[in-house]
Amino acid sequence: MRKIIHVDMDCFFAAVEMRDNPALRDIPIAIGGSRERRGVISTANYPARKFGVRSAMPTGMALKLCPHLTLLPGRFDAYKEASNHIREIFSRYTSRIEPLSLDEAYLDVTDSVHCHGSATLIAQEIRQTIFNELQLTASAGVAPVKFLAKIASDMNKPNGQFVITPAEVPAFLQTLPLAKIPGVGKVSAAKLEAMGLRTCGDVQKCDLVILLKRFGKFGRILWERSQGIDERDVNSERLRKSVGVERTMAEDIHHWSECEAIIERLYPELERRLAKVKPDLLIARQGVKLKFDDFQQTTQEHVWPRLNKADLIATARKTWDERRGGRGVRLVGLHVTLLDPQMERQLVLGL
């Protein structure tokens, strides 16, 4: 049985700012773009979250909720330096590390001899070491598979951890809401609830064939997760090549104005996700995806050096006009392709 730890730093960007400037510790702060430039919030500290300020929220809305919010532009070199230090701490316990972004990672400690081989004690020690060396707090989840470790890391935030032992998995899954499973969004959750499926326990009683007919490939993933099955390895060679966000509509859309409104809502989340893996927002390409009512889909990309909403909207409009052919649209997606590390190095050297 594997021992997987998911470590997730607590409001990472904001925590670095509070550490380096103690005057910020007890006031609401957020990292994000200015209201004048229609920026979005990347992360907010816990005092700001009490006012409802959240990641991916437009800055203007955040300032309405919390007029005395201190807005910071971000110091991404400082965040990258802290992230590298955290990753070095991970490497003291295992070489099997899969970073997901600057502030979270999976660790496979199945074969680790540290702390007498106890994943629970390793997670505690890692969190304490991060605090001792960086004065930052982390939360952790421990479980026999990746998706449960990720869910567990959110159970006792901030500055806590939650353990799901192999023996506890069946009982934990029985009452686990399907919306907690990574990949189950609001639309999917609503469709599942309409089928009478609210928890993993409900899905365990459902015929796999029904899920496959209703959700396709995702139906199998959902069924497996509800059984506690997740065979994905912690991949230390993992190199993220793209970042995306998409929305499946409850009803097909037929007007460009509807599509544009969805893009406006998706863009802040794309920006937030990209900032977690690429704080400078430099990219190789960006593009859009449309899926039609006949389940055919099309994508269109442009070479573009930095995330740009106006270009994404223009690309989507061109795709809508040229490829829709009168069909309804059931899914809208935005994505970026990241720079190859070698190409990025050449760009930096050329500056």
Curated annotation (Swiss-Prot):
Binds 2 magnesium ions per subunit. Residues 4-185 form the UmuC domain. The active site is at E104. Mg(2+) binds at D8, D103. Its EC number is 2.7.7.7. GO terms for cellular component: cytosol. The record marks F13 as: Substrate discrimination. It comes from the Bacteria. The keyword Lyase does not apply. Monomer. PANTHER family: DNA POLYMERASE KAPPA (PTHR11076:SF33), DNA REPAIR POLYMERASE UMUC / TRANSFERASE FAMILY MEMBER (PTHR11076). This is DNA polymerase IV. It comes from Escherichia coli O6:H1 (strain CFT073 / ATCC 700928 / UPEC). The lineage of its organism: Bacteria, Pseudomonadati, Pseudomonadota, Gammaproteobacteria, Enterobacterales.
